[in-house]
Amino acid sequence: MDQIINDGTCSLFDIFDGHSSDLGHIYEELFDDDELIPAVEDELLGYENIVLIKSIILKPEYRGQGLGGILALAIAELFGEQDIVALKPWPMNPDGPDNPAGVWDLPRLTETAQKTIAKKLGKSYMGAGFKPLFKGSSHLFLTHYRNPTATQLIDTWHKEHQNVKA
């Protein structure tokens, strides 16, 4: 896991964008000239860190069942209450930087299929408590932990899927 610390000698943009384009995009959504934009300032006041879940990969047989949101929540629960957790609900590209040497068996998707899957991913993540901080945000954020927990959600999921198989 990468960690970035601002010692005050660089602008936040340089720190975010210099690390990865993903963090640069989060900066563009949350900051203007190194200050939180007013639309998110009240929501984020008091948080110390931004944790970015860059990718979640499920085996094909587990996709489309709402497990991605539960897994994202379980990851978020590993961090402190002073951390805001962010992710972007978008399917991974088989040729993208998160799939070096084609390690993961990812399908090639049309633009329409990507948008359809992104909507499903967003619904799964929002079902686990993630939300956009403002209309038009491409990222979803978890700013505090709500009930149910990831464990409670997986127990519910398991019960629902046992009934389907029975």
Indicate where each model-derived feature is located.
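Hydrophobic positions on the alpha1 helix immediately C-terminal to the Walker A/P-loop
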Residues: 71
